[in-house]
Amino acid sequence: MLWLIAIFLFIVILVLLFLLNFYKDPNRTVPKGRNIVAPADGRIISIIDTSKNKLMIKKGLIGKVRIFTKGIAKECYIISIFMSPFDVHINRAPIEGTVKSIKHTKGKFFKAYDLERSFENEKNEIIIKNKKLKVKVIQIAGFLARRIKCYVKKNQKVNKGQKIGMI
C-alpha cells in the first residue's frame, strides 16, 4: 500500500513541476531602439514571403495565407514560431503602438508545428499599429495548449515587449 502512495505522490510532483514550468514567466529586458522583438519564445518553423514573386507554397494553402495577412498588407512576411511545452507561453507586443483590432476565431486543435493544419486551429489575431509599422500577432492554439488568453483590448496602447496574451 505504501508503494501506491509513493507512486501517486511521484506522479503528482511530476505534474506540478510540468505546470510550474509551463506557466513560467521570467523577466525580459526589451532592447531599445527601432527594432521588432519576437512575440513568442520558441523555434521559428517557417518564414513565408507573401510578395507575388515569392509566394510559392502548396496548392490550397495560398488562400489560407491570404486570409492570415488580411488587414495588414498584400506583401509581408509570416513568421511562424512553434512553442514547445518547455517554452514560455506568454506572448508579447513586437512593437510599441496601439491595438487596432482583436479577432478570436474558434477552430480545431491540430498539432501546432504542422503549419498547414495549424491554419485551421483556434486563433486570436491582434493587430498593433504605430506611425511606421503595422504588425499582426496570431496566437494559435494547438494539441496541448488549447486555451488562448488575450490581455489587451482594442485601442489600448502597448509598449514593445509588453505582455499581450498567453497560449
Protein language model regions, located:
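Contiguous, well-folded functional domains in the mature portion of proteins
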Residues: 1-167
